[in-house]
Swiss-Prot record:
Changing residue 211 to A: Partial relocalization in the host nucleoplasm. A zinc finger (CCCH-type) spans 106-211. Belongs to the herpesviridae NEC1 protein family. This is Nuclear egress protein 1. The modification Phosphoserine is found at residue 19. Keywords: Host membrane, Host nucleus, Membrane, Metal-binding, Phosphoprotein, Zinc, Zinc-finger.
Length: 376
């Protein structure tokens, strides 16, 4: 009837209108995609980002949904390009090497799981919070003699050792990494020790829930370069970041060690700091020993050391997941053993035997923290 009279029925008019709207929507989407690609191409050709006046509108989620509905093959390509799960989270294994960190992801460590979280999906980061950069940390390193009290938590970790402090002035990344971590997490306890003339740092987080923003991680890696390995692990139920030096690069920055040492000697160590080192004494001893094993690339899976302050052996578990060993070995070089007169015969005999069988290179022993730190 409609073909005879030349008048369309309401159903035909609605069908034609839907067809027209569909074609118009497809043309608009195609023009958006083409303008986005052309804008990116022109920016790459000139080596500069497009100016705000030339900026093109970005595709919305609704636009992507319409495109994928019309072209399912593009949806598959888009999913193959994604390196993280759609949820924006990815579990990590410990110990975690920061050099394997994915860009633009934060770290969430808690008793419920350890994950890398995409920055856009992170609920802990604040948009208006500005963290320092590696350059800011270098400026703070240069001006540290004028900001002793501001960075006093860092100097407590030296236990007033002039040898360790002198090494730190030739290794700016140690201070830089601490400075960046402290800006993101204030409840940390750093301490230093030396192996073969190289300074290393371990940072203990006092809270079980730790969030490290992606900007902080990026700046830490910038400061560390290839000379330092930065790893995160959980040791004795505490989150620990270890910064181990592999090579000392020549630094053009010179710090007056005499002035720095004099100001640090004038500082009093608070009671709570002494108590924290007393509380972490076994953890500190374990980290010093395990870092020495990593640097010397020993294949020892587990060992036990005898603490000079306690009569019972201190079992140390290696970071590779093996259980504690029941056998005891010689006291590590950084733990001062008791005098020969107070040692039992079987302990002296065992120590002499272990020294004959183990020819480990000698290095400058770091101070024993528990003997160095005492409340005023």
């Amino acid at each position: 009837m409609s073909s005879v009279s030349g008048v369309r029925t309401p159903r035909e008019r609605r069908s034609a209108l839907r067809s027209l709207l569909r074609k118009r929507r497809q043309r608009e989407l195609a023009s958006k995609v083409a303008s986005t690609v052309n804008g990116a191409t022109s920016a790459n050709n000139h080596g500069e980002p497009p100016s705000p006046a030339d900026a093109r509108p970005r595709l919305t989620l609704h636009d992507l949904h319409d495109i994928f509905r019309e072209h399912p093959e593009l949806e598959l390509k888009y999913l193959n390009m994604m390196k993280m799960a759609i949820t924006g989270k990815e579990s990590i294994c410990l110990p975690f090497n920061f050099h394997s960190h994915r860009q633009h992801t934060c770290l969430d460590i808690s008793p419920y799981g350890n994950e890398q979280v995409s920055r856009i999906a992170c609920t802990s980061c604040e948009d208006n919070r500005i963290l320092p950069t590696a350059s800011d940390a270098m400026v703070a390193f240069i001006n540290q003699t004028s900001n002793i009290m501001k960075n006093r938590n860092f100097y407590y970790g030296f236990c007033k050792s002039s040898e360790l402090l002198k090494l730190s002035t030739n290794q700016p990344p140690i201070f830089q990494i601490y400075y960046l971590l402290h800006a993101a997490n204030h409840d940390i306890v750093p301490f230093m020790h030396a192996e073969d003339g190289r300074l290393h740092m371990h940072v203990i987080f006092e809270n079980p829930d730790v969030h490290i923003p992606c900007d902080c991680i990026t700046q830490m890696l910038t400061a560390a370069r290839e000379d330092y390995s930065v790893t995160l692990n959980i040791v004795r139920d505490h989150v620990v970041i270890s910064v181990l030096c592999h090579a000392v690069s020549a630094s053009s920055v010179k710090i007056d060690v005499t002035i720095l040492q004099r100001k640090i000697d004038e500082m009093d160590i608070p009671n709570d700091v002494s108590e924290s080192f007393e509380r972490y004494k076994e953890l500190i001893q374990e980290l010093c020993q395990s870092s020495g094993n990593n640097l010397y690339e020993e294949a020892t899976s587990s060992y036990a050391i005898r603490s000079p302050l306690t009569a019972s052996p201190l079992h140390v578990v290696s970071t590779n997941g093996c259980g504690p060993s029941s056998s005891s070995q010689s006291t590590p070089p950084h733990l001062h053993p008791p005098s020969q007169a107070t040692q039992p015969h079987h302990y002296s005999h065992h120590q002499s035997q272990s020294q004959q069988h183990h020819h480990r290179p000698q290095s400058p022993p770091p101070p024993l923290f528990l003997n160095s730190i005492r409340a005023p």
